[in-house]
Amino acid sequence: KENLSLSDFSSLIGYSLLTAKDLCRIKDITPDLSDLIRNELPKYREINEFVKTIKNPSLTTGRIKRSFFQCLFDIEKEEPVMPYLRVLGMKKEASSLLSQKENASCQILTKLAFDVPKMDDTAKKLFAKDLLASDLYRQVFCHKYNQTLPNEYQHSPIVL
């Protein structure tokens, strides 16, 4: 099975770091990490190499990578809590639980074309970031493997 690696997103992440106006507003990026990124950014060639360049004892590799993707998707420190849940799959015997989704404390997405128009503006803004992440993944995958993948509106939850 084909997979993508961090290096497949190297150019996109490099671009997002170069064009970010204020890295400190990005979730998980502290002023110290922002300064480190800005100081080392002129040397940026490839993402894995850049992670090694800025890694230090107070920064884990995972945190650095996560902060880079948060920059790519413009996830700010003050983002609201996710106001919806998305069903990706379920067991057939559990599908009856979906009839209770009207009573849920947050919106449960099963059919995007039907559910997204019902979202409030905050949820739609956050969902747009989900779509961007999915679309970028799909685009990078298609470019690397010369295959197409369905977009988020073209597939339903998997029933096992």
Q: Positions of the model-derived regions?
A:
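Non-catalytic terminal extensions that flank enzyme cores
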Residues: 1-160
